[in-house]
């Protein structure tokens, strides 16, 4: 969601902070700002919109002397996007940035207003600044006052604060929101993500949950759990768009490579392997998959695979619902939490609840140092690489692939899948990887037909069995980047209400599998065609009633079909959004990493 950067040192602070914010830009934001304390002078700069606006504001500024500094990209939760609501928030003597949500800010704000504090913004974060100023009236020690103020907050937060009385230090607080600190030759650096620090630091610390402290160049060495950056491999990847029009297009094209990376060391000689000790999976009789957004659609798809291949009961639950639904747990239940970032707030809290209930836990994520990977029993990395675009493509595909592999591996350990079936599934996985190569003819056809789908009152994406979750994902992709209304449905559900919306101005994207329920799905498509919906069919089998037909190559299995259709719906969403002139990498109102509830 939001991004935090902090720096203590004598390098030029504007460039350090802006470079860090640029690395966090893909997470999504609507405003940005920074504060620098140097030579006894506190300066704050804030702008609405893109980082370019902040750069223009700072065009003639340089901060060359030693000092402390903080910066932030904001995604609005309390208060509209504006310069006033942007971070840092400040008083005469301090400035701070904050990721998270302060749940009791309204009552704290009322108390502070009664004591004479005047607020300039609509945010929950500004309350923290005034709360600290108020606390300092009775507690002169800065760290103690900071700790006392933090203890009054309810909610989630990662906070960095600088104060005129502490010219060589930054104060931090962390609870349910990521924050990392590291030290290198040029000083001490803070960030929301370790990847931002990797090129700059030799040592780093993932700050502990519910920790509060003060850090300077001198006392960094006193932190607990210091790790050496050289012990970890951070690939120096080319993050430029290259010849692609945007990062989303690039990442769609990268999926063949990212899926190969996902399977590296996990599929050899048509046998599947996994980093999880078979003993850990012994006696597992039920699986709960917990996630949000695209990860939830990957979870739904895997339910069919776990039940069909491993012969084990599985269910997919939205993380935001799991936390409050009081589900009865099973002692032999395996809880799988799925999140690209490994920091998704609802999924993280659901994982903590599962741990508290004594369940066996596995995290699937794309970040080796994420909070989810640190608290679960085991972590399986999807190895999708960095996704700059907010809309998930590589991560979704890799999640489905890894869950598919896990279903076969689990069946192998439980004795519910034969060696021959394992070989068949392994071959199908390799075929599915190859299916994710973008054929120029396919892309050109989708680009041409996309112009038909720019107007109307909405889209139905329909599919059955494992293609139902893919219909949900296809509809989500279109919604995210085109801002057109789209809904995914199980095909047979049309007659139970949604068909009332069908007319000549409604588009249907039909996922017609040759291998699963072909005749049933065809019948559902005919029902929609009879009511004048414009039908676009994705299939290897020609359907005469289709108004548009995206013919896919023949597939040997339904999962190979799944990945071929996945690629096609991603390209269709991309091309429709491009025709509508939208910023597909940074859709409005969306954040890449949702670290608040």
UniProtKB/Swiss-Prot annotation:
Entry function: Catalyzes the first step in hexosamine metabolism, converting fructose-6P into glucosamine-6P using glutamine as a nitrogen source.
HAMAP family according to UniProt: GlmS (MF_00164)
CDD domains assigned to the protein according to its UniProt record, in alphabetical order: GFAT, SIS_GlmS_GlmD_1, SIS_GlmS_GlmD_2
Keyword tRNA processing included in the entry's annotation: no
Name of encoding gene: glmS
Localization terms from the record: Cytoplasm
Binding partners and assembly: Homodimer.
GO cellular component, one term: cytosol
Residues annotated as domain SIS: 276-416, 449-587
Keyword match Cytoplasm: yes
Active-site annotation: 2 (nucleophile), 592 (for fru-6p isomerization activity)
One Pfam entry name: SIS
GO molecular function: carbohydrate derivative binding; glutamine-fructose-6-phosphate transaminase (isomerizing) activity
GO biological process, one term: UDP-N-acetylglucosamine metabolic process
Protein name listed in UniProt: Glutamine--fructose-6-phosphate aminotransferase [isomerizing]
Enzyme Commission designation: 2.6.1.16
Reactions mediated catalytically: D-fructose 6-phosphate + L-glutamine = D-glucosamine 6-phosphate + L-glutamate
The Glutamine amidotransferase type-2 domain, residue ranges: 2-218
Enzyme class, UniProt record, top EC level: transferase
Sorted UniProt keywords: Aminotransferase, Cytoplasm, Glutamine amidotransferase, Repeat, Transferase
Domain of life of the native organism: Bacteria
Main subcellular location of this protein, as a coarse class: cytoplasm
InterPro entries cross-referenced by the UniProt entry: GATase_2_dom, GFAT, GFAT_N, GlmS/AgaS_SIS, GlmS/FrlB_SIS, Ntn_hydrolases_N, SIS_dom, SIS_dom_sf
């Amino acid at each position: 969601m939001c991004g935090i950067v902090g720096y203590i040192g004598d390098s030029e602070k504007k460039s350090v902070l802006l470079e860090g914010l640029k690395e966090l830009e893909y997470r999504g934001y609507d405003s940005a700002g920074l504060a620098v304390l140097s030579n006894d002078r506190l300066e704050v700069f804030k702008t609405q919109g893109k980082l370019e606006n902040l750069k223009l504001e700072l065009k003639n500024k340089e901060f060359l002397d030693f000092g402390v500094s903080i910066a932030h990209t904001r995604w609005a939760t309390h208060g509209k996007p504006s310069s006033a609501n942007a971070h840092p928030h400040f008083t005469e003597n301090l400035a701070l940035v904050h990721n998270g949500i302060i749940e009791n800010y309204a009552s704290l704000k009322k108390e502070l207003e009664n004591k004479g504090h005047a607020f300039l913004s609509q945010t929950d974060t500004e309350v923290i600044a005034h709360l600290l100023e108020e606390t300092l009236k009775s507690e002169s020690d800065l760290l103690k006052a900071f700790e006392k103020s933090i203890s009054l907050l309810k909610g989630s937060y990662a906070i960095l604060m600088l104060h005129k009385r502490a010219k060589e230090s930054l104060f931090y607080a962390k609870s349910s929101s990521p924050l990392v600190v590291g030290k290198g030759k040029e000083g001490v650096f803070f960030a929301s993500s370790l990847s931002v620090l990797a090129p700059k630091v030799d040592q780093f610390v993932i700050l502990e949950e519910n920790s509060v402290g003060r850090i300077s160049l001198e006392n960094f060495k006193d932190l607990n759990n210091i790790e050496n950056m050289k012990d970890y491999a951070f690939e120096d990847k080319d993050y430029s768009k290259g010849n692609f029009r945007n990062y989303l297009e690039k990442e769609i094209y990268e999926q063949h490579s990212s899926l190969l990376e996902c399977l590296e060391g996990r599929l050899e000689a048509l046998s599947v392997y996994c980093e999880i000790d078979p003993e850990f999976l012994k006696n597992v009789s039920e699986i709960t998959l917990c996630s949000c957004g695209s990860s939830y659609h990957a979870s739904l798809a895997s339910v069919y695979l776990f039940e069909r291949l491993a012969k084990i009961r599985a269910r997919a639950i939205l993380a935001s619902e799991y936390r409050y639904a009081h589900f009865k747990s099973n002692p032999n239940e395996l809880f799988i939490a799925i999140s690209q970032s490994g920091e998704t707030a609802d999924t993280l809290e659901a994982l903590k609840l599962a741990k508290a209930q004594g369940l066996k836990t596995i995290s699937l994520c794309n970040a080796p140092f994420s909070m989810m990977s640190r608290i679960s029993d085991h972590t399986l990395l999807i190895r999708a690489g960095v996704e700059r675009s907010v809309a998930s493509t590589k991560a979704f595909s890799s999640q489905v692939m890894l869950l598919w592999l896990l279903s076969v591996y689990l069946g192998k350990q439980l004795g519910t899948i034969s060696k021959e079936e394992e070989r068949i599934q392994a071959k199908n996985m390799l075929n599915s990887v190859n299916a994710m190569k973008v054929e120029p003819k396919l892309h050109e056809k989708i680009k041409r037909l996309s112009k038909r789908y720019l107007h109307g009152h909405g889209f139905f994406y329909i599919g059955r069995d494992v293609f139902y979750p893919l219909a949900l994902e296809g509809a989500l992709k279109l919604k995210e980047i085109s801002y057109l209304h789209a809904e995914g449905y199980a095909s047979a559900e049309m007659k139970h209400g949604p068909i009332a919306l069908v007319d000549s101005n409604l588009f249907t994207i039909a996922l017609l599998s040759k291998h699963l329920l072909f005749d049933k799905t065809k019948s559902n498509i005919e029902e929609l065609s009879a009511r004048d919906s414009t039908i676009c069919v994705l299939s290897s089998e020609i359907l005469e009633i289709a108004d548009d037909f995206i013919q896919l190559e023949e597939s040997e299995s339904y999962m190979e079909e799944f990945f071929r259709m996945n690629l096609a719906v991603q390209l269709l969403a991309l091309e429709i959004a491009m025709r509508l002139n939208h910023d597909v990498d940074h859709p409005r109102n969306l954040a890449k990493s949702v670290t608040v509830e």
